């Protein structure tokens, strides 16, 4: 039982969209670092270290401090994100079931790879191998390549990621491949290059095409392996140069990130923003 605004909201079995096995999972993994998700005014569920490090800083630079708005950032892995989201959904089969009055933004990656990233002869930008399935049709990674998915399949993938949306739960899917790829593509390429190399001189050697440049930078991020978190921390410091310039900074961000932050805080002033 939780209290919000002087009202009680039961979250036991039968009162939320959670299944019995979801409760077992949450009892095991809902540690003290995630418990505040029930007492916040808003929640952002994220799946990666980069989001954990950068989303609070991005929100701050947009003039929408998560702390000021009582928003909790909760890190979950991809498979468990839906379980956490279901906590906030009411059970439509129970007459007296009421959803928790907490806005929840779920940030997730599209996870479809562009052809420009394929490692093959003649492609200087490629770094990911395209793998065919075995003789039994199993394995491989063809399903992850953007060009090998029809638009209906892509739409189905997006719908699956957002299958528990409704009431106050809303999923925001990356405009392109991943969170970091989008940051590189839509305006922060130079800053990411600096975070990766500790200099900005070499950025002129990157492709002049924003998409190819993002592929190059994401290849460099992937090559960091376990050191990717250090890149995120460096980037958080570098983008602090946009402090006091929310309108300028906003133009350098992919739209899905801006919309997610607005959803759990409040709308930003009306300014022209390019749709990606």
Locate the predicted segments by residue:
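Acidic, divalent-metal-binding catalytic cores of TOPRIM
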Residues: 1-276
